[in-house]
From Swiss-Prot:
It comes from the Bacteria. GO terms for molecular function: dGTPase activity; magnesium ion binding. dGTPase preferentially hydrolyzes dGTP over the other canonical NTPs. It comes from Yersinia pseudotuberculosis serotype O:3 (strain YPIII). Pfam families: HD, HD_assoc. This is Deoxyguanosinetriphosphate triphosphohydrolase. Its EC number is 3.1.5.1. GO terms for biological process: dGTP catabolic process.
Protein backbone atom coordinates (compact mmCIF):
# COMPACT_ATOMS: atom_id res chain seq x y z
CA UNK A 1 0.00 0.00 0.00
CA UNK A 2 2.09 2.87 -1.24
CA UNK A 3 1.46 6.33 0.10
CA UNK A 4 0.79 5.26 3.70
CA UNK A 5 3.25 7.07 5.92
CA UNK A 6 2.07 7.81 9.45
CA UNK A 7 4.84 10.38 9.86
CA UNK A 8 2.64 12.59 7.66
CA UNK A 9 -0.23 12.23 10.14
CA UNK A 10 1.30 11.99 13.62
CA UNK A 11 2.47 15.56 13.93
CA UNK A 12 4.04 16.65 17.22
CA UNK A 13 3.77 20.37 16.46
CA UNK A 14 1.64 22.63 18.68
CA UNK A 15 -0.39 25.72 17.67
CA UNK A 16 1.01 28.07 20.35
CA UNK A 17 4.64 26.87 20.35
CA UNK A 18 7.69 27.16 18.15
CA UNK A 19 8.12 24.29 15.68
CA UNK A 20 9.55 21.20 17.35
CA UNK A 21 12.56 19.48 15.81
CA UNK A 22 12.34 16.25 17.82
CA UNK A 23 13.90 13.38 15.86
CA UNK A 24 15.04 10.89 18.48
CA UNK A 25 12.37 8.28 19.34
CA UNK A 26 12.34 9.18 23.02
CA UNK A 27 12.19 12.91 22.27
CA UNK A 28 9.08 12.28 20.18
CA UNK A 29 7.59 10.11 22.94
CA UNK A 30 8.21 12.90 25.47
CA UNK A 31 6.16 15.30 23.34
CA UNK A 32 3.14 13.04 23.64
CA UNK A 33 3.82 12.35 27.32
CA UNK A 34 3.45 16.10 27.74
CA UNK A 35 0.05 15.87 26.04
CA UNK A 36 -0.93 13.12 28.49
CA UNK A 37 0.00 15.27 31.47
CA UNK A 38 -1.89 18.29 30.17
CA UNK A 39 -5.00 16.20 29.54
CA UNK A 40 -5.05 14.07 32.69
CA UNK A 41 -4.49 17.11 34.92
CA UNK A 42 -7.08 19.30 33.20
CA UNK A 43 -10.24 20.50 34.93
CA UNK A 44 -12.32 19.17 32.03
CA UNK A 45 -11.30 15.60 32.88
CA UNK A 46 -12.01 16.11 36.59
CA UNK A 47 -15.49 17.41 35.83
CA UNK A 48 -16.35 14.16 34.06
CA UNK A 49 -16.70 12.49 37.46
CA UNK A 50 -19.88 14.50 38.06
CA UNK A 51 -21.36 14.30 34.58
CA UNK A 52 -23.88 11.63 33.72
CA UNK A 53 -23.43 8.59 31.53
CA UNK A 54 -27.04 7.34 31.57
CA UNK A 55 -28.41 8.09 35.05
CA UNK A 56 -28.21 11.81 35.97
CA UNK A 57 -27.58 12.89 39.58
CA UNK A 58 -26.71 9.29 40.53
CA UNK A 59 -25.37 8.83 44.06
CA UNK A 60 -24.44 5.15 43.69
CA UNK A 61 -20.70 5.19 42.91
CA UNK A 62 -20.97 1.78 41.23
CA UNK A 63 -23.02 3.37 38.44
CA UNK A 64 -20.87 4.97 35.76
CA UNK A 65 -20.11 8.64 35.42
CA UNK A 66 -18.60 10.07 32.24
CA UNK A 67 -15.18 9.70 33.86
CA UNK A 68 -15.43 5.99 34.68
CA UNK A 69 -16.88 5.36 31.22
CA UNK A 70 -14.01 7.29 29.62
CA UNK A 71 -11.43 5.25 31.54
CA UNK A 72 -13.02 2.08 30.17
CA UNK A 73 -12.98 3.50 26.64
CA UNK A 74 -9.31 4.40 27.13
CA UNK A 75 -8.45 0.80 27.99
CA UNK A 76 -10.33 -0.64 24.99
CA UNK A 77 -8.75 1.96 22.69
CA UNK A 78 -5.31 0.96 23.93
CA UNK A 79 -6.13 -2.69 23.25
CA UNK A 80 -7.27 -1.98 19.67
CA UNK A 81 -4.17 0.14 19.00
CA UNK A 82 -1.89 -2.64 20.28
CA UNK A 83 -3.75 -5.21 18.19
CA UNK A 84 -3.28 -3.12 15.03
CA UNK A 85 0.41 -2.47 15.71
CA UNK A 86 1.03 -6.14 16.45
CA UNK A 87 -0.49 -7.10 13.10
CA UNK A 88 1.66 -4.49 11.38
CA UNK A 89 4.71 -6.05 13.09
CA UNK A 90 3.72 -9.55 12.00
CA UNK A 91 3.34 -8.31 8.43
CA UNK A 92 6.67 -6.42 8.69
CA UNK A 93 4.95 -3.13 7.87
CA UNK A 94 6.13 -0.94 10.77
CA UNK A 95 8.96 0.74 8.84
CA UNK A 96 7.05 0.76 5.55
CA UNK A 97 4.22 2.68 7.23
CA UNK A 98 6.57 5.17 8.91
CA UNK A 99 5.83 3.90 12.42
CA UNK A 100 9.30 2.82 13.55
CA UNK A 101 9.62 5.81 15.95
CA UNK A 102 5.91 6.28 16.53
CA UNK A 103 4.68 3.11 18.26
CA UNK A 104 4.27 4.73 21.69
CA UNK A 105 2.75 7.94 20.28
CA UNK A 106 0.28 5.87 18.20
CA UNK A 107 -1.03 4.22 21.38
CA UNK A 108 -0.88 7.37 23.49
CA UNK A 109 -2.84 9.49 21.00
CA UNK A 110 -5.60 6.87 20.92
CA UNK A 111 -5.68 6.51 24.71
CA UNK A 112 -5.88 10.23 25.40
CA UNK A 113 -8.50 10.77 22.69
CA UNK A 114 -10.58 8.07 24.37
CA UNK A 115 -10.17 9.76 27.74
CA UNK A 116 -11.20 13.13 26.25
CA UNK A 117 -13.98 11.97 23.95
CA UNK A 118 -16.81 13.16 26.23
CA UNK A 119 -15.32 16.34 27.70
CA UNK A 120 -17.51 18.61 25.59
CA UNK A 121 -20.77 17.02 26.70
CA UNK A 122 -23.07 19.35 28.67
CA UNK A 123 -24.84 18.46 31.93
CA UNK A 124 -27.49 15.75 31.52
CA UNK A 125 -25.96 14.37 28.35
CA UNK A 126 -27.96 14.44 25.13
CA UNK A 127 -30.97 16.04 26.82
CA UNK A 128 -28.76 18.91 27.95
CA UNK A 129 -27.54 19.17 24.37
CA UNK A 130 -31.12 19.24 23.08
CA UNK A 131 -32.10 21.90 25.61
CA UNK A 132 -29.32 24.23 24.42
CA UNK A 133 -30.16 23.67 20.76
CA UNK A 134 -33.91 24.07 21.23
CA UNK A 135 -33.45 27.27 23.23
CA UNK A 136 -31.19 28.88 20.62
CA UNK A 137 -33.15 27.55 17.64
CA UNK A 138 -36.30 29.21 18.97
CA UNK A 139 -34.49 32.57 19.13
CA UNK A 140 -32.26 32.21 16.06
CA UNK A 141 -34.81 30.70 13.63
CA UNK A 142 -31.87 29.37 11.57
CA UNK A 143 -33.98 28.02 8.70
CA UNK A 144 -35.90 31.29 8.44
CA UNK A 145 -32.58 33.03 7.93
CA UNK A 146 -31.17 30.81 5.20
CA UNK A 147 -29.77 32.53 2.15
CA UNK A 148 -28.68 36.11 1.70
CA UNK A 149 -31.96 38.04 1.43
CA UNK A 150 -34.65 38.83 4.03
CA UNK A 151 -37.63 36.48 4.14
CA UNK A 152 -41.13 37.18 5.39
CA UNK A 153 -41.04 34.12 7.65
CA UNK A 154 -37.80 35.17 9.39
CA UNK A 155 -38.62 34.82 13.11
CA UNK A 156 -35.17 35.63 14.50
CA UNK A 157 -35.48 37.40 17.87
CA UNK A 158 -31.96 38.87 17.76
CA UNK A 159 -32.04 42.21 15.98
CA UNK A 160 -28.39 42.21 14.90
CA UNK A 161 -28.81 38.78 13.24
CA UNK A 162 -31.94 39.56 11.22
CA UNK A 163 -31.40 39.60 7.46
CA UNK A 164 -31.63 43.05 5.87
CA UNK A 165 -32.29 44.35 2.37
CA UNK A 166 -29.20 45.03 0.29
CA UNK A 167 -26.69 43.50 2.76
CA UNK A 168 -25.86 40.28 0.93
CA UNK A 169 -22.43 39.63 2.46
CA UNK A 170 -23.54 40.50 5.99
CA UNK A 171 -26.66 38.38 5.57
CA UNK A 172 -24.54 35.36 4.64
CA UNK A 173 -22.58 35.90 7.85
CA UNK A 174 -25.77 36.36 9.90
CA UNK A 175 -27.24 33.17 8.47
CA UNK A 176 -24.04 31.26 9.17
CA UNK A 177 -23.96 32.41 12.81
CA UNK A 178 -27.63 31.61 13.37
CA UNK A 179 -27.03 28.04 12.21
CA UNK A 180 -23.82 27.76 14.21
CA UNK A 181 -25.40 28.82 17.52
CA UNK A 182 -28.34 26.45 16.99
CA UNK A 183 -26.06 23.42 16.56
CA UNK A 184 -24.40 22.89 19.93
CA UNK A 185 -22.67 19.49 19.88
CA UNK A 186 -20.48 17.80 22.47
CA UNK A 187 -17.78 16.82 19.98
CA UNK A 188 -17.52 20.36 18.61
CA UNK A 189 -17.46 21.73 22.15
CA UNK A 190 -14.54 19.40 22.96
CA UNK A 191 -12.48 21.01 20.19
CA UNK A 192 -13.40 24.46 21.53
CA UNK A 193 -12.61 23.43 25.08
CA UNK A 194 -9.08 22.13 24.50
CA UNK A 195 -8.09 24.89 22.07
CA UNK A 196 -9.96 28.11 22.88
CA UNK A 197 -11.02 27.78 26.52
CA UNK A 198 -8.41 25.67 28.33
CA UNK A 199 -5.65 26.45 25.81
CA UNK A 200 -3.98 23.12 26.51
CA UNK A 201 -1.77 23.66 23.44
CA UNK A 202 -1.96 19.97 22.56
CA UNK A 203 -0.25 18.58 19.49
CA UNK A 204 -2.24 18.78 16.28
CA UNK A 205 -2.30 14.97 16.13
CA UNK A 206 -3.82 14.68 19.59
CA UNK A 207 -6.61 17.15 18.84
CA UNK A 208 -7.11 15.68 15.37
CA UNK A 209 -7.96 12.39 17.03
CA UNK A 210 -11.02 13.89 18.78
CA UNK A 211 -12.33 15.60 15.63
CA UNK A 212 -14.93 12.85 15.26
CA UNK A 213 -17.21 14.60 12.78
CA UNK A 214 -15.99 16.87 10.02
CA UNK A 215 -18.93 19.18 9.31
CA UNK A 216 -18.84 22.78 10.56
CA UNK A 217 -21.78 23.63 12.83
CA UNK A 218 -22.96 26.38 10.46
CA UNK A 219 -23.29 23.97 7.51
CA UNK A 220 -26.71 24.23 5.82
CA UNK A 221 -25.99 22.88 2.32
CA UNK A 222 -26.73 19.28 1.29
CA UNK A 223 -24.17 16.80 2.63
CA UNK A 224 -22.17 14.96 -0.06
CA UNK A 225 -22.98 11.24 -0.20
CA UNK A 226 -19.26 10.41 -0.04
CA UNK A 227 -19.12 11.90 3.48
CA UNK A 228 -22.65 11.43 4.81
CA UNK A 229 -21.42 9.48 7.83
CA UNK A 230 -18.41 11.65 8.62
CA UNK A 231 -20.59 14.77 8.35
CA UNK A 232 -23.72 13.51 10.11
CA UNK A 233 -23.11 15.83 13.10
CA UNK A 234 -21.27 19.12 13.64
CA UNK A 235 -17.58 18.61 14.40
CA UNK A 236 -16.47 22.17 15.13
CA UNK A 237 -17.82 25.71 15.42
CA UNK A 238 -17.22 28.81 13.34
CA UNK A 239 -15.12 30.11 16.25
CA UNK A 240 -12.57 27.31 15.74
CA UNK A 241 -12.73 27.17 11.95
CA UNK A 242 -9.33 28.79 11.36
CA UNK A 243 -7.71 26.46 13.90
CA UNK A 244 -9.28 23.41 12.22
CA UNK A 245 -7.93 24.62 8.87
CA UNK A 246 -4.45 24.82 10.43
CA UNK A 247 -4.90 21.35 11.89
CA UNK A 248 -5.90 19.90 8.53
CA UNK A 249 -2.86 21.42 6.84
CA UNK A 250 -0.54 20.10 9.54
CA UNK A 251 -2.06 16.59 9.44
CA UNK A 252 -2.40 16.44 5.64
CA UNK A 253 -6.17 16.01 5.86
CA UNK A 254 -8.51 16.96 3.04
CA UNK A 255 -11.61 18.99 3.89
CA UNK A 256 -14.28 16.80 5.54
CA UNK A 257 -11.86 13.87 6.00
CA UNK A 258 -10.96 12.41 9.37
CA UNK A 259 -7.74 11.71 11.26
CA UNK A 260 -7.03 7.95 10.91
CA UNK A 261 -6.72 7.16 14.62
CA UNK A 262 -10.15 8.67 15.28
CA UNK A 263 -11.70 5.48 13.89
CA UNK A 264 -10.04 3.55 16.74
CA UNK A 265 -11.35 5.94 19.40
CA UNK A 266 -14.85 5.64 17.95
CA UNK A 267 -14.73 1.83 17.95
CA UNK A 268 -13.50 1.77 21.56
CA UNK A 269 -16.43 3.96 22.61
CA UNK A 270 -18.92 1.75 20.74
CA UNK A 271 -17.59 -1.39 22.43
CA UNK A 272 -17.46 0.13 25.91
CA UNK A 273 -20.78 1.88 26.28
CA UNK A 274 -22.90 -0.93 24.82
CA UNK A 275 -21.96 -3.18 27.76
CA UNK A 276 -21.69 -0.45 30.39
CA UNK A 277 -25.24 0.85 29.89
CA UNK A 278 -26.64 -2.64 30.43
CA UNK A 279 -24.51 -3.29 33.51
CA UNK A 280 -25.59 0.02 35.05
CA UNK A 281 -29.23 -0.89 34.40
CA UNK A 282 -28.80 -4.14 36.35
CA UNK A 283 -27.06 -2.21 39.14
CA UNK A 284 -30.11 0.09 39.23
CA UNK A 285 -32.49 -2.92 39.33
CA UNK A 286 -34.14 -1.96 36.06
CA UNK A 287 -33.91 -5.61 35.10
CA UNK A 288 -32.13 -8.74 36.31
CA UNK A 289 -29.35 -10.60 34.54
CA UNK A 290 -31.86 -13.30 33.60
CA UNK A 291 -34.22 -10.72 32.11
CA UNK A 292 -31.32 -9.09 30.28
CA UNK A 293 -30.36 -12.43 28.76
CA UNK A 294 -33.96 -12.90 27.56
CA UNK A 295 -34.02 -9.40 26.04
CA UNK A 296 -30.74 -10.01 24.20
CA UNK A 297 -31.69 -13.47 22.93
CA UNK A 298 -34.99 -12.09 21.60
CA UNK A 299 -33.11 -9.39 19.69
CA UNK A 300 -30.58 -11.88 18.29
CA UNK A 301 -33.17 -14.37 17.07
CA UNK A 302 -32.63 -18.11 16.87
CA UNK A 303 -29.47 -19.04 18.78
CA UNK A 304 -27.47 -21.99 17.50
CA UNK A 305 -24.70 -23.70 19.50
CA UNK A 306 -21.35 -22.22 18.54
CA UNK A 307 -22.65 -19.01 16.97
CA UNK A 308 -21.27 -15.68 18.19
CA UNK A 309 -24.17 -15.01 20.56
CA UNK A 310 -23.67 -18.42 22.14
CA UNK A 311 -19.90 -17.89 22.47
CA UNK A 312 -20.20 -14.41 23.97
CA UNK A 313 -23.52 -13.95 25.79
CA UNK A 314 -24.44 -17.59 26.26
CA UNK A 315 -21.01 -18.47 27.64
CA UNK A 316 -21.21 -15.59 30.14
CA UNK A 317 -24.71 -16.62 31.21
CA UNK A 318 -23.64 -20.22 31.74
CA UNK A 319 -21.03 -19.02 34.23
CA UNK A 320 -23.80 -17.85 36.57
CA UNK A 321 -23.64 -19.84 39.77
CA UNK A 322 -20.38 -21.61 38.96
CA UNK A 323 -18.37 -19.37 41.26
CA UNK A 324 -20.87 -18.88 44.09
CA UNK A 325 -19.34 -17.09 47.05
CA UNK A 326 -16.40 -15.67 45.10
CA UNK A 327 -18.32 -12.72 43.64
CA UNK A 328 -21.92 -11.68 43.05
CA UNK A 329 -23.67 -13.38 40.16
CA UNK A 330 -24.17 -10.00 38.42
CA UNK A 331 -20.48 -9.11 38.69
CA UNK A 332 -19.58 -12.57 37.46
CA UNK A 333 -21.89 -12.35 34.45
CA UNK A 334 -20.68 -8.91 33.35
CA UNK A 335 -17.03 -9.77 33.83
CA UNK A 336 -17.37 -12.70 31.43
CA UNK A 337 -19.65 -10.77 29.08
CA UNK A 338 -17.11 -7.96 28.86
CA UNK A 339 -14.14 -10.29 28.39
CA UNK A 340 -15.97 -12.28 25.72
CA UNK A 341 -17.28 -9.20 23.89
CA UNK A 342 -13.98 -7.32 23.91
CA UNK A 343 -12.18 -10.50 22.87
CA UNK A 344 -14.31 -10.72 19.72
CA UNK A 345 -14.89 -7.08 18.82
CA UNK A 346 -11.36 -5.72 19.30
CA UNK A 347 -9.78 -8.08 16.73
CA UNK A 348 -12.67 -7.35 14.37
CA UNK A 349 -12.14 -3.58 14.71
CA UNK A 350 -8.41 -4.03 14.12
CA UNK A 351 -9.05 -6.17 11.06
CA UNK A 352 -11.45 -3.61 9.62
CA UNK A 353 -8.85 -0.85 10.18
CA UNK A 354 -6.23 -2.85 8.29
CA UNK A 355 -8.52 -4.10 5.50
CA UNK A 356 -9.59 -0.53 4.74
CA UNK A 357 -6.24 1.09 5.50
CA UNK A 358 -5.93 3.32 2.39
CA UNK A 359 -9.33 4.95 3.04
CA UNK A 360 -8.82 4.99 6.82
CA UNK A 361 -5.38 6.58 6.44
CA UNK A 362 -6.70 9.30 4.14
CA UNK A 363 -9.68 9.81 6.46
CA UNK A 364 -12.27 9.27 3.73
CA UNK A 365 -13.56 5.92 5.07
CA UNK A 366 -17.23 6.87 5.38
CA UNK A 367 -18.39 4.52 8.13
CA UNK A 368 -17.46 3.25 11.57
CA UNK A 369 -15.12 0.28 11.93
CA UNK A 370 -17.88 -1.61 13.73
CA UNK A 371 -20.47 -0.99 11.05
CA UNK A 372 -20.69 -3.89 8.63
CA UNK A 373 -22.73 -7.04 8.05
CA UNK A 374 -20.62 -9.26 10.32
CA UNK A 375 -21.88 -11.22 13.32
CA UNK A 376 -19.64 -9.06 15.53
CA UNK A 377 -21.47 -5.92 14.48
CA UNK A 378 -24.83 -7.65 14.81
CA UNK A 379 -23.91 -8.45 18.41
CA UNK A 380 -23.01 -4.82 19.07
CA UNK A 381 -26.32 -3.69 17.59
CA UNK A 382 -28.41 -5.99 19.79
CA UNK A 383 -26.70 -4.56 22.88
CA UNK A 384 -27.62 -1.07 21.69
CA UNK A 385 -31.21 -2.02 20.84
CA UNK A 386 -31.77 -3.59 24.25
CA UNK A 387 -30.47 -0.41 25.90
CA UNK A 388 -32.79 1.77 23.81
CA UNK A 389 -35.86 -0.38 24.45
CA UNK A 390 -35.37 -1.26 28.10
CA UNK A 391 -32.96 1.28 29.66
CA UNK A 392 -33.28 4.68 27.99
CA UNK A 393 -37.09 4.39 27.93
CA UNK A 394 -37.32 3.46 31.61
CA UNK A 395 -39.53 5.90 33.61
CA UNK A 396 -36.71 6.78 36.04
CA UNK A 397 -34.33 7.66 33.21
CA UNK A 398 -36.97 9.66 31.35
CA UNK A 399 -37.95 11.55 34.51
CA UNK A 400 -34.34 12.56 35.17
CA UNK A 401 -33.86 13.58 31.54
CA UNK A 402 -36.94 15.80 31.69
CA UNK A 403 -35.58 17.41 34.85
CA UNK A 404 -32.23 17.94 33.15
CA UNK A 405 -33.88 19.53 30.11
CA UNK A 406 -35.78 21.92 32.38
CA UNK A 407 -32.66 22.80 34.38
CA UNK A 408 -30.60 23.70 31.29
CA UNK A 409 -33.47 25.57 29.63
CA UNK A 410 -34.08 27.42 32.89
CA UNK A 411 -30.44 28.41 33.27
CA UNK A 412 -30.42 29.78 29.73
CA UNK A 413 -33.53 31.82 30.57
CA UNK A 414 -31.86 33.13 33.73
CA UNK A 415 -28.69 34.23 31.91
CA UNK A 416 -30.51 35.54 28.82
CA UNK A 417 -30.51 39.20 30.04
CA UNK A 418 -26.79 39.23 29.21
CA UNK A 419 -27.67 38.41 25.60
CA UNK A 420 -30.34 41.10 25.49
CA UNK A 421 -27.93 43.92 26.41
CA UNK A 422 -26.86 46.36 23.68
CA UNK A 423 -23.33 45.71 22.44
CA UNK A 424 -21.98 48.98 23.86
CA UNK A 425 -23.46 48.29 27.29
CA UNK A 426 -22.10 44.75 27.44
CA UNK A 427 -18.68 45.95 26.29
CA UNK A 428 -18.69 48.49 29.13
CA UNK A 429 -19.74 45.79 31.61
CA UNK A 430 -16.82 43.61 30.52
CA UNK A 431 -14.34 46.50 30.71
CA UNK A 432 -15.50 47.93 34.06
CA UNK A 433 -16.78 44.70 35.67
CA UNK A 434 -20.04 46.52 36.44
CA UNK A 435 -22.68 48.67 34.79
CA UNK A 436 -24.77 51.05 36.87
CA UNK A 437 -27.81 50.79 34.58
CA UNK A 438 -27.75 46.99 34.50
CA UNK A 439 -27.58 45.74 38.12
CA UNK A 440 -29.06 42.28 37.41
CA UNK A 441 -26.85 41.75 34.38
CA UNK A 442 -23.82 42.83 36.40
CA UNK A 443 -24.50 40.17 39.01
CA UNK A 444 -25.11 37.51 36.37
CA UNK A 445 -21.85 38.48 34.68
CA UNK A 446 -19.98 38.07 37.98
CA UNK A 447 -21.23 34.48 38.20
CA UNK A 448 -19.55 33.53 34.91
CA UNK A 449 -16.20 31.82 35.33
CA UNK A 450 -13.03 33.85 34.76
CA UNK A 451 -11.87 31.32 32.15
CA UNK A 452 -14.96 31.88 29.99
CA UNK A 453 -14.94 35.66 30.45
CA UNK A 454 -11.29 35.80 29.34
CA UNK A 455 -12.06 33.71 26.26
CA UNK A 456 -14.83 36.15 25.32
CA UNK A 457 -12.60 39.19 25.92
CA UNK A 458 -9.84 37.69 23.78
CA UNK A 459 -12.27 36.99 20.93
CA UNK A 460 -13.76 40.49 21.17
CA UNK A 461 -10.29 42.02 20.99
CA UNK A 462 -9.43 39.93 17.94
CA UNK A 463 -12.41 41.33 16.00
CA UNK A 464 -12.00 44.90 17.27
CA UNK A 465 -10.79 46.31 13.93
CA UNK A 466 -13.60 44.87 11.82
CA UNK A 467 -16.14 47.27 10.27
CA UNK A 468 -18.80 48.14 12.85
CA UNK A 469 -21.56 46.07 11.20
CA UNK A 470 -19.40 42.94 11.18
CA UNK A 471 -18.13 43.63 14.68
CA UNK A 472 -21.67 43.78 16.11
CA UNK A 473 -22.54 40.44 14.52
CA UNK A 474 -19.39 38.68 15.69
CA UNK A 475 -19.61 40.28 19.15
CA UNK A 476 -23.06 38.81 19.66
CA UNK A 477 -21.80 35.46 18.41
CA UNK A 478 -18.98 35.31 20.96
CA UNK A 479 -21.30 36.55 23.70
CA UNK A 480 -23.70 33.68 22.95
CA UNK A 481 -20.74 31.30 22.92
CA UNK A 482 -19.79 32.67 26.36
CA UNK A 483 -23.18 31.63 27.77
CA UNK A 484 -23.08 28.24 26.04
CA UNK A 485 -19.53 27.65 27.28
CA UNK A 486 -20.44 28.45 30.88
CA UNK A 487 -23.61 26.38 31.11
CA UNK A 488 -22.31 23.42 29.08
CA UNK A 489 -19.22 23.29 31.29
CA UNK A 490 -21.22 22.75 34.47
CA UNK A 491 -21.47 19.34 36.10
CA UNK A 492 -24.92 17.78 36.52
CA UNK A 493 -25.04 18.52 40.24
CA UNK A 494 -23.73 22.09 39.91
CA UNK A 495 -26.29 22.88 37.19
CA UNK A 496 -29.09 21.41 39.31
CA UNK A 497 -28.02 23.33 42.43
CA UNK A 498 -27.43 26.57 40.50
CA UNK A 499 -30.88 26.38 38.95
CA UNK A 500 -32.50 25.83 42.36
CA UNK A 501 -30.53 28.70 43.92
CA UNK A 502 -31.35 31.19 41.18
CA UNK A 503 -35.00 30.15 41.13
CA UNK A 504 -35.08 30.74 44.93
CA UNK A 505 -36.18 27.14 45.40
CA UNK A 506 -34.09 26.68 48.52
Amino acid sequence: MSGIDFKQKISFQRPFSKPSSAEDEYEITRVFESDRGRIVNSAAIRRLQQKTQVFPLERNAAVRSRLTHSLEVQQVGRYIAKEILNRFKQDKKITAYGLDKLLDPFESIVEMACLMHDIGNPPFGHFGESAINDWFTKRMDPNGGSGSEPQSRDQCQVEVLKLREGETELNILRSKIRHDLSQFEGNAQAIRLVHSLLKLNLTYAQVGCILKYTKPAYWSAPIPASHNYLMKKPGFYLAEENYVKELRRELNMEEFDRFPLTYIMEAADDISYCIADLEDAVEKNIFSVEQLYDHMSQEWGAVTPGDLFDKVVGAAFRQLGREQGRRSSEDQFFMYLRVNTVGKLVPHAAQRFIENLPAVFSGSFNQALLEDSSAACKLLQIFKRVAVKHVFNHPEVEQLELQGYRVISGLLDIYSPLLAMPETAFTQLVADDRHRKYPIETRLFHKLSIKHRLAYAESAERIRNLPSEQYEIYEYYYRARLIQDYISGMTDLYAYDEYRRLMAAE
